[in-house]
Structure formats: C-alpha cells, structure tokens
C-alpha cells in the first residue's frame, strides 16, 4: 500500500463509509472509534488505525488509478455497436420496517393476528418487516446507432399489494421508480432521489469532486481486484460514497461496486442507502452491468416507523445482432405490449431472475385480509380522501368508485366578490365508462348571491384506466362554465378557489364574471409531442371595482390643455350605466403545439405531475379572434416559449423559462397581455410574486424566469447551520413589455375610439386613481427572491423583492412567500 496515502483518512474525515454495506456482502466495522474494516471481514482481517492527513491529488496513486479507470470507460460503451439489445428484469418492493413481536399484542395490530403470517426478516437489517407492495417488470432494451435511438419494450408488468387500494394505481410505484432510479456508474450524471449525482468515474469533474483511497487487494469472482474507497470532498454535498473493485490488469474494468451516500448527506427522509452492483465482461470485451441491488431505508420522522424500499435489476442476454426496423416503429421511448399486464405465472417463472419471498408473493392476500377486517373500510375511506383530495363513493373492490367527490380543499373558501363561498364538485371515473367522462361543480357566494358552476364532458379516444388526463391523451372535450375570477387564474397549477389561495397579499378589487363555452381537442403522442385546438365563446362582465368604459365616453381635457383622460364614476352626475359597457363578448380559435422529449407523468386524481423535468419544453401557440361569429373583436395573439433545467452537480440546479408574445390587433385591455400575477402568500412556480392584479398591459412582451436551487451548497459550509439541512434558493423574474400606440387609451390620437377601454383604477373620494399602466419599453420589471428551503424537510420560505416600478406609494416592494413541498 502506498505510504503517502492514509487508507483510513477518509473514514476519519467522513465517518460515512460505514454505510457502504453491500446488500449481500456485509461489511464489518470494528468497535474502536478510530478504526475500520472496509472489505468483507474474515478471521484475521487487519484493522488499520485512522490517522488524519491532508488530502492531496498530486502524485496520489489512487487518483492516478482512477484517471486510468475513467479513460478506460470508452471501451465499455455499448453505443459503439450498430445495434444492441438486452433483457431486463426489475423488481421494486416496499415494506414497513422495524416490526417487533410486541406490536401484535397491543394497539391497532392486535386485531390483525394474520399479520404474523406476512412478516419476514430483512436480510439487510435483521429486523422484521411487513411487505406492502411488489412491482415487477420484464422488458427488452433496444438500440440502433444510425438513428441514435434507444427504446424499451415492456413484455410483462405485475403490481400487487397496497397499489391495489389506490385508484390511480400506478402512483406509488411511479413515485418510487422516479425517486429511486437505476444507478449506473458508467454514466457521468446519475439522476437519483430527484437530484443529479456525479458518478465517481465521471469523465468530467469526478476527480475534483471526490476523494479516492486505495484500500486493499481482493478477489471478485476469481479475479484479482484493487479496492478503492471514495466520497465527496464535503460529506453534505449530493454525492456518493463507497468502494469500487477495479480489475488489477491493463483493462481497468470495474468488477463490483458498493455504493451509498454519506451519513451527513442532506438528502431528506433517507436513513440509509446501499447499492451493490456486479459487472460482467461480454465476449466482445465490454464491461457491463449485470446486477443492481438497491436497498433504501426511509424515515420521515423519528417517532414514525421506518420503511424499506428494495429495487433489484438484472440484465441478461446482451446481443449485438442487427435488429428489425419494425421493433422501433412506435412513438416515445417505451412501448407496453398489449398483454403485458395479463401474463400468467408460467411467464413470470420463466423470466423472474430473483424469486419472490413468501411474504412478497402474498401481498395481494394481505390486502384482501385487511379489507375484510370489520370496521376497517371507513378508516381506509377517510385515508384515501385525505391523500387523494377526492372522496370516493365506493372502496369496494368488486364495485369500485364510479364517481369521486372533490377536490376537498375547494369546498369552502372566500374572495372579495363571493364573500364566503361554498362549492360542491364531482367527477366520474373509468369505472363508470373508460371513454366518456364528466366533471363539474356548483358554487354559491354569500355576498353576491350568485350561483356559479362548471360542467365538462370528455370523450377519450383511448381507453383510460381511471381519468381522461392520463398520458397520452386523445380527448374531445366540451365544457360550460360561469364563475368569477381574475385573469391570472388561468395560469395556476391548482384550483383558483383552493382554500389556501384565499390568503392574498394584495387587495383584489378588479374581478369579472366569465361565462364561457369551450370545445377542445387535445392529442398527445408518446414521443412528447402535443397538439391542442380550442374553440371558445366567452362573455365577461366586470364587477366590484372593475368597469369597461370606452375612451370616447370618458372625460377628456379641454382643447389647448395637456391631454388627459379620466373615466366618469360615482358622484359625477353622469348616467354611468349608459357610459360603461356591460359585457365583452369574444369568440376565438386557438392552436397550441408543445414538444417535450422524454416526457413522463405521475397521475393523481387532481392533476398530472411532471416527473422528467430535465427534458426541455418547447411551445408555440396562436389565437385568432373571430369577429362576426358572436364576437366583438378580431385579433391575433402569438406566443412562444422554452423551458430548460440545467444541473450543476453539487451546486444544485437552475431552471430557465423564457416566453415572448404579441397581440397584433386593436383590442381593449381585457384582451391585452397581462403578467402572471400570483396574488397569494403561497408561492407558485413560474408566476410574478409582487405584480398587482391587472397592473401592466402590453401587446408585446418577453420574459425570463430563473430559479436556482443550490441544494445547501453554502449553508452546508457554515458551522451549526449545516446541521439544519436547509437549502438556498435564488430566483429572478424579468418582464419586458411594450404597448403600441393603437392600444394605448392615454394617447390623444385615440380620444374618439369606442373599441378600447380606459385602464382599470379606483375612485377615492370622487377622484379616479389608475392602477393599470402601459410599461416603459426601456425599463423592464425586475423582481428577485431569496429563499430558505427544506425547513423541517417540508417548508419553503422566500423573501421576495421588487426593484423597478416602485415610485407608486401603493406598490408593495417586498414580501414573504411560503409553500409546503415534499422533496428529497
């Protein structure tokens, strides 16, 4: 062993390699604090005393060795071949951990004596566990070099256990698969626990990010190997730790890897991760992954039970034979064979490379026994309602829910026009009809005494499992709605009358009733392409402090005086009813094209959750106003946009969202372009935090929204604060806007026009004070946010500051926004 490198320095400095326990190759750690044993311990194993030294990369044999390993990676790149295919078996299991015999004798489990038949001992922890769900997938991965195309064909898919209790059944498995993705160290960047980790053998950056130590020589499958331990420079950064077993020959191939994360890692809810990887050499010389055995121990809080997640993946039958073009003839990256979910036991016996345990094989029986417990169904019904935000009308497996009531968080809320607002909502499910769907709501405001509502009928050309929004869509929808709101409501990711949105930082005084009919065709393809066409007829009615007064009807300064315009209001002596327009009626046709390669969603009852946020999103839309077709105006609105996420390894991630657009015709202010104003204290992604309702009006705009989550890169280096595991967030929103002369009501050239309206404002003691303006094209709107995220692993708090357009005393220059979000 080289004398200039302390083999135990890394353990002393990190105290984290004790977590690098191979799943089937247990590592022994000696009781003496400053000592360790990294290899598989056996009688006579040497124990090395830790000695603290300064780490140096210069002339470091471990670093020199790793540079050779990294350089040799190219020889194992399967994409050098014209074709390749491989069979893949994947098993994902989820279990309740740390079960003790005592729990069966008291409390809730006392009424479930059958649970004793379903528990088993975890080989990783030695404790009793209760398997809750098992998901298995058999697939074939195929690749062709000419088109640089890699795809997956799913031949078998099987789900048992707790997933059967969730109506959108794939949500649990999809979330676990998205969080605990496959780890392949031969890839430079590894997406894991919804973040990006740098591989210890990444071509760029690994040598500077990790520290390496030569530990020992050992044998793996009869091959002499050099064991190298590794870990990040800062144990709180998002990085791996563990050991690599490198072939002691000129190929520098990796035979085995034991991977974990540091004890001090700021990854949330993860108490322990162990990943054991085995590699094999193909006859053609490439070193490829053969088995990936992952074990994760989750802990949400100290007072709660821990959970075990296991993911076992095995690759077999590597082949470089030519593949038929027919195999690649499907859109998207994944194709599920029609009979994949109907495979019989014979298929699984043939393709299952790791047998299920007795308890794993009985997870369906376990769920049935749970459901047969007297009095249990009301508790399950309440639990499902709280988790899914919808109340199912049945939880009987033989008669599943055909109608779900909800969302629950919209039943009671408030706004300035409605006052206290009550809403009843419901939607049908695929159990009613897998092609025809209905959803709607009825609401009533105590203050305005008006009934509002929405009804929507959808026909899905594709058979759905539960809801029509499941990806990919091919839906024809007709809807009618009558409700009150503000223009920014259309940009929200949640329902506009979500009870939490009632907490507004700005006094909302300009609202409108909107009665609209929509006919929508929405088509998505597996490769990420989306086409949406909408025909809309809408009639808006201003309410509260909002009014539609044509410029020609407003008071204007006398000839010879500087031009100014002021609307007539209460106390003016004018008949306001004759001056103001009661309604604005439009009919328009819009077309939207969006492309997001590699798109993937998790389905919930309320919305789809985008999981592959690394892929860019390109979008373009155009809307045409159809005057004469029950419409007051002709107009053309064009918008484009692109969104991209960039990972910076240990420095976190940056999100960029750019958009631009133009309203080409003469239109009143309700048809101009207004910023996406978030009026709530609850933080919303991709919205302006300090722009007031209807504050800016543009017919040309460009905007950039930037967010940088640093993953604790700075806080992790501050003593004491680093123990809190909080993370930094920086955001900047910039809006450039311009209003052309033809749409500016404040210009004298428009004084006689009745097709544009005076901008919104309010009357104070008979004096009109405008609250909406045209932006100065030389001065962009700029706001920034500085946040502390991951407080108690849930709460995000941001300080937001506005830097331009701050001369008006009524403007709010700064504020605090918050949100609750579960992240790893």
Outline where the language-model segments fall.
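Periplasmic N-terminal soluble interaction domains immediately after the signal peptide in Gram-negative
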Residues: 1-59, 272-274, 292-305
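Extended lipid/amphipathic-ligand handling interfaces
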Residues: 215, 242-248, 274-284
């Amino acid at each position: 062993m080289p004398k200039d490198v302390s083999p135990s320095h890394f353990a002393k400095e990190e105290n984290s390699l004790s977590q690098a326990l191979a799943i089937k190759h247990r590592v022994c750690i000696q009781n003496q604090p400053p000592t360790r044993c990294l290899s598989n311990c056996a009688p006579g194993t040497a124990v090395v005393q830790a000695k603290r030294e300064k780490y140096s990369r210069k002339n470091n044999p471990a670093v020199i060795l790793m540079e050779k390993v990294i350089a040799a990676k190219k020889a194992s790149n399967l994409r050098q071949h014209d074709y390749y295919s491989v069979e893949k078996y994947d098993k994902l299991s989820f279990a309740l951990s740390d079960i003790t015999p005592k729990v069966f004798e008291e409390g809730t489990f006392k009424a479930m004596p059958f649970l004793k038949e379903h528990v088993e001992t975890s080989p990783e922890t030695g404790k009793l566990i209760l398997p809750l769900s098992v998901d298995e997938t058999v697939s074939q991965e195929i690749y062709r070099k000419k088109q640089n195309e890699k795809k997956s064909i799913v031949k078998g898919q099987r789900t048992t256990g707790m997933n059967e209790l969730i109506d959108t059944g794939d949500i649990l498995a999809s979330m676990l698969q998205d969080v605990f993705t496959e780890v392949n160290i031969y890839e430079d960047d590894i997406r894991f626990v919804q973040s990006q980790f740098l591989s210890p053998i990444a071509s760029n950056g690994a040598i500077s990010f990790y520290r390496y130590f030569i530990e020992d020589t050992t044998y793996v499958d009869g091959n002499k190997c050099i064991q190298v331990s590794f870990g990040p420079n800062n144990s709180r950064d998002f990085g791996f730790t563990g050991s690599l077993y490198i072939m002691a020959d000129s190929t520098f191939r990796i035979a085995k890897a034991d991977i974990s994360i540091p004890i001090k890692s700021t990854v949330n809810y993860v108490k322990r991760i162990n990943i054991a990887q085995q590699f094999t050499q193909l006859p053609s010389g490439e070193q490829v992954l053969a088995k990936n055995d992952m074990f994760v121990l989750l802990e949400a809080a100290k007072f709660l039970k821990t959970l075990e997640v296991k993911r076992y993946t095995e690759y077999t039958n590597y082949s470089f034979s030519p593949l038929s073009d027919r195999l690649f003839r499907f859109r998207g990256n994944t194709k599920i064979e029609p009979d994949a979910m109907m495979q019989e036991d014979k298929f699984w016996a043939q393709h299952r490379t790791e047998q299920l345990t007795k308890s794993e094989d009985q997870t369906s029986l376990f769920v049935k026994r749970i459901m047969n417990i007297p009095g249990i169904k009301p508790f399950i019904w309440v639990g499902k309602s709280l988790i899914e935000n919808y109340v199912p009308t049945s939880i009987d497996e033989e008669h599943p829910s055909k109608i779900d009531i909800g969302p629950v968080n919209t039943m009671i809320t408030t706004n300035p026009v409605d006052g206290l607002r009550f809403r009843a909502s419901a939607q049908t499910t695929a159990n009613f009809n897998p092609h025809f769907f209905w959803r709607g709501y009825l609401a009533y405001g105590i203050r305005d005494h008006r009934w509002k509502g929405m009804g929507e009928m959808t026909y899905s050309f594709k058979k759905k499992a539960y809801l029509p929004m499941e990806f990919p869509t091919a839906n024809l929808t007709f809807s009618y709605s009558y409700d009150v709101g503000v223009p920014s409501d259309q940009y929200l990711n949640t329902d506009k009358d979500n009870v939490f949105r009632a907490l507004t930082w700005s006094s909302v005084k300009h609202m409108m009733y909107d009665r609209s009919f929509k006919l929508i065709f929405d088509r998505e393809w597996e490769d990420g392409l989306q086409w949406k066409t909408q025909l809309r007829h809408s009639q808006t009615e201003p309410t509260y402090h909002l009014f539609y007064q044509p410029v020609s009807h407003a008071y204007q300064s006398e000839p010879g005086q500087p031009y100014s315009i002021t609307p007539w209001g209460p106390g003016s002596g004018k008949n306001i009813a004759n001056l103001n327009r009661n309604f604005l009626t439009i009919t328009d046709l819009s077309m939207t094209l969006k492309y997001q390669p590699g798109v993937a969603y998790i389905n919930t009852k309320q919305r789809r959750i985008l999981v592959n946020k690394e892929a860019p999103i390109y979008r373009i839309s155009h809307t045409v106003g159809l005057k004469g077709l029950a419409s007051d105006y002709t107009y053309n609105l064009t918008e484009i946009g692109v969104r991209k996420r960039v990972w910076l390894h240990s420095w976190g991630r940056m999100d960029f969202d750019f958009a631009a657009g133009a309203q080409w015709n003469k239109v009143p202010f309700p048809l101009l372009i207004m910023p996406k104003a978030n009026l709530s204290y609850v933080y919303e992604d991709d919205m302006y935090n300090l722009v007031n309702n209807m504050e800016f009006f543009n017919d040309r705009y460009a905007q950039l929204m930037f967010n940088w989550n640093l993953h604790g890169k700075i806080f992790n280096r501050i003593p004491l604060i680093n123990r809190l595991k909080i993370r930094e967030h920086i955001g900047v929103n910039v809006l450039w806007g311009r209003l052309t002369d033809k749409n500016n009501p404040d210009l004298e050239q428009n004084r006689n026009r009745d097709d544009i309206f005076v901008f919104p404002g309010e009357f104070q003691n008979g004096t009109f004070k405008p609250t909406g303006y045209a932006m100065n094209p030389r001065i962009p709107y700029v706001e920034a946010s500085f946040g502390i995220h991951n407080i108690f692993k849930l709460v995000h708090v941001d300080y937001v500051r506005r830097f331009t357009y701050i001369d008006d005393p009524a403007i709010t220059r700064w504020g605090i926004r918050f949100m609750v979000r579960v992240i790893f």
